[in-house]
Amino acid sequence: MWIKELELKHYRNYDHLLASFSSGLNVFIGNNAQGKTNFLEAIYFLSLTRSHRTRADKELIHFDHSTVSLTGKIQRISGTVDLEINLSDKGRVTKINALKQAKLSDYIGTMMVVLFAPEDLQLVKGAPSLRRKFIDIDLGQIKPVYLSELSHYNHVLKQRNSYLKSAQQIDAAFLAVLDEQLAGYGARVMEHRIDFINALEKEANTHHQAISNGLESLSLSYQSSVVFDKKTNIYQQFLHQLEKNHQKDFFRKNTSVGPHRDDLAFYINGMNANFASQGQHRSLILSLKMAEVSLMKALTGDNPILLLDDVMSELDNTRQTKLLETVIKENVQTFITTTSLDHLSQLPEGIRIFHVTKGTVQVDSDIH
């Protein structure tokens, strides 16, 4: 899939913008604080209905206005699709082909994106919540049912935690009802995650071995807070641990086990990647991003759109070459932001260059 056209109204520092793109590489050049990242954020927002930079939707609205409108014309294998998001103080409205979508799980996945931003370099050593978010964003685009089950899980989790905080003593019968619901949704969330990580590991290891010239292997491990011996037993063992932890959870006023506390670990040649060098970290993250692209295509039959936000300068020539070779080979529409073309070691034919200045975008040229 690829974005043919994007229109922004009152988004960040863009009062109004209408732009069309190449189905291949699109490079956005400009000084800092001109709107390059805002532009990629808009594509991300149109795909996932959320920003990767802020939780406050009001920050997305141009200072002179009270509403935001994003529309995009997306070319999929199945045909052209029009996406639209309208944002105001009353909330957000999402539409596909002018039809309002009642649930996020009906909207997300229509346009898949993979974002590679400087903050992704913290994925390995950062907080576990970053790694859970990484899994949830990918799985939500690949499997709409996952978003629905995760939403149900979070709703029951909120109910359970609220009860634990307010209760004067344990009502075992009431907790048992919540435990069964939480274990049911949670087990399915974990099953989806485990299958996804196993598939992602194979793709990521293939890319990592290519980047390291066969010297390094990359493995991933889903770290569950629920102890289980095999995937088919997750529900029963999750439920058992919830029941076992009633007193502990009551004392702590929260739920101590479940997918909301799970993590993801990375290993290079069998060694925890927390102890890897900076160069190895960059190779690992690059391998993951390329694996996201190839796995989404393998599981859905369509390519995602790749957003590279000021990361090319973080990669040496070898890693840049591997990345560009992959997107060209896989025919992935790619958006790159940079302050200078000097940060790109080589540019293939058929790219479109845009100059970004104070919320305006001007097409420079197509290189053939």
Swiss-Prot record:
<dbReference type="GO" id="GO:0000731">
    <property type="term" value="P:DNA synthesis involved in DNA repair"/>
</dbReference>
<keyword id="KW-0235">DNA replication</keyword>
<comment type="similarity">
    <text>Belongs to the RecF family.</text>
</comment>
<protein>
    <recommendedName>
        <fullName>DNA replication and repair protein RecF</fullName>
    </recommendedName>
</protein>
<keyword id="KW-0234">DNA repair</keyword>
<keyword id="KW-0963">Cytoplasm</keyword>
<dbReference type="GO" id="GO:0009432">
    <property type="term" value="P:SOS response"/>
</dbReference>
<dbReference type="InterPro" id="IPR042174">
    <property type="entry name" value="RecF_2"/>
</dbReference>
<dbReference type="GO" id="GO:0005524">
    <property type="term" value="F:ATP binding"/>
</dbReference>
<dbReference type="InterPro" id="IPR001238">
    <property type="entry name" value="DNA-binding_RecF"/>
</dbReference>
<keyword id="KW-0238">DNA-binding</keyword>
<keyword id="KW-0067">ATP-binding</keyword>
<keyword id="KW-0742">SOS response</keyword>
<feature type="binding site">
    <location>
        <begin position="30"/>
        <end position="37"/>
    </location>
    <ligand>
        <name>ATP</name>
    </ligand>
</feature>
<dbReference type="InterPro" id="IPR027417">
    <property type="entry name" value="P-loop_NTPase"/>
</dbReference>
<comment type="function">
    <text>The RecF protein is involved in DNA metabolism; it is required for DNA replication and normal SOS inducibility. RecF binds preferentially to single-stranded, linear DNA. It also seems to bind ATP.</text>
</comment>
<dbReference type="Pfam" id="PF02463">
    <property type="entry name" value="SMC_N"/>
</dbReference>
<keyword id="KW-0227">DNA damage</keyword>
<dbReference type="InterPro" id="IPR003395">
    <property type="entry name" value="RecF/RecN/SMC_N"/>
</dbReference>
<dbReference type="GO" id="GO:0005737">
    <property type="term" value="C:cytoplasm"/>
</dbReference>
<dbReference type="GO" id="GO:0006302">
    <property type="term" value="P:double-strand break repair"/>
</dbReference>
<dbReference type="InterPro" id="IPR018078">
    <property type="entry name" value="DNA-binding_RecF_CS"/>
</dbReference>
<keyword id="KW-0547">Nucleotide-binding</keyword>
<dbReference type="GO" id="GO:0006260">
    <property type="term" value="P:DNA replication"/>
</dbReference>
<dbReference type="GO" id="GO:0003697">
    <property type="term" value="F:single-stranded DNA binding"/>
</dbReference>
